[in-house]
Amino acid sequence: MHKSVAPAPSILLLGFMASLPGFGVDMALPALADTAASLGASAHGASLAISSYMASFGIAPLVYGPISDRYGRKPIILIGCVVFILASIGCALAPSLPILLGCRVIAGLGAAAMALAMAMARDVYDDSVFRQKLSTIVVAIYVSPIAAPIAGAAVLALAGWRTIYVGLATLGMLLLVGVWLGLHEGSKSRQPGRLRILAMIKDYGRVLSHPACRSYLLASATSFGAVGAYATGSALFFIKAAGMSPNQFSLIFGLTSLASAAGAVLDSRLAAQGIASLYTVAGGLAIVVLGSTILTAMTLAGWTPIAVTVSLFVAMTFSVGGAGPGIMQGSMQQLPELSGTISAAGNCLAMVMGSLSSGLAAIFFDGRTLLSTTVAMLLCSTLALLSFLAAARGTTKPCSVPS
């Protein structure tokens, strides 16, 4: 049932909101070399424009989540939009690398408020309706890695790297207007005193000490870890070992991103038909475990034909995309009054696990095979499946299980 009636455009705005942080990363990627040359910096120095943004984006939601549980989501999101706009303009005008990096850190702080999109949807929708709407948001998140680099490359070719940040500021302005006019506050769980540091710590303690919620968050983080290992490890394998060009690999990465989006769309359709997320999540994660096991065995046998390997990656990313909305729904339905805190914790844990798994896949890459990638994916997906099953057994609000 609906908790409240939200205007139809709201969920589209939430999808736009959730995808904006990804645009902040992926639109800037094609311009790193030009940025370095323009500012007299090294390639490594220019790449810090990405990592500095991601670091602040990963940490800031830990503060925004509890604040939004106290004051509501919309004010935090509006402030985040303004910060993102101003910082992006600062990036466009930056005369040196240190100023660019400082503005990117601030832009990440603003973009971090967009992580509240999930919590805002949870405030408005409940049960299978929430899962359907959440799938729409997830589709937007998965599509952004395809659209953003293309847009960034086009802008770079037409007007230079600084215009990319003008474009990001423009996206921020569009979102600001959309949120101001089109989104309505749905949080009803505001509590005085929530801003105190000890109260915030207590909220996170409640979330992490709740067995089912903790297991859902671990399942979410480790499933994202499998994706992180794939993203880094597959690039190393296909480009360095298989000899593909970056453009050829981008086609494979785009295909798997579309597969993830298609999985989320299918989950939305299944939710509309009353199919419980218990089945879609468990089935999806089991496919990832099976696929990574097969790829590991193929790698050890020295047989990894490109067509078969890509097909398995497509199947696994499709399955992760289909499982994601159900995992997020499960985590937030345990403590709905702390949806912002749960969303923030999930975002931070996912960033940490994604960075860890992708780092390990890169560190242990042997220059020839997919072994480090497939093992990392197997470990992450197995832990995700076990965590989800533990959460499903221990949940106190099993609304995702059919009656």
Where are these regions (language model features)?
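Helix-loop-helix hairpin linking two adjacent transmembrane segments in secondary transporters
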Residues: 99, 127, 135-181
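Juxtamembrane intracellular "pre-TM" segments in multi-pass secondary transporters
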Residues: 1-4, 184-217
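Paired small-residue
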Residues: 83, 87-90, 98-106, 307-313
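Helix-breaking motifs and short loop linkers at transmembrane-helix boundaries and internal kinks
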Residues: 38-40, 72, 93-99, 243, ...
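A late C-terminal transmembrane helix in Major Facilitator Superfamily
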Residues: 328-366, 377
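Conserved MFS/SLC helix-loop-helix module at the cytosolic interface between two early adjacent transmembrane helices
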Residues: 58-97
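Cytoplasmic helix-loop-helix junction between adjacent transmembrane helices
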Residues: 103-141
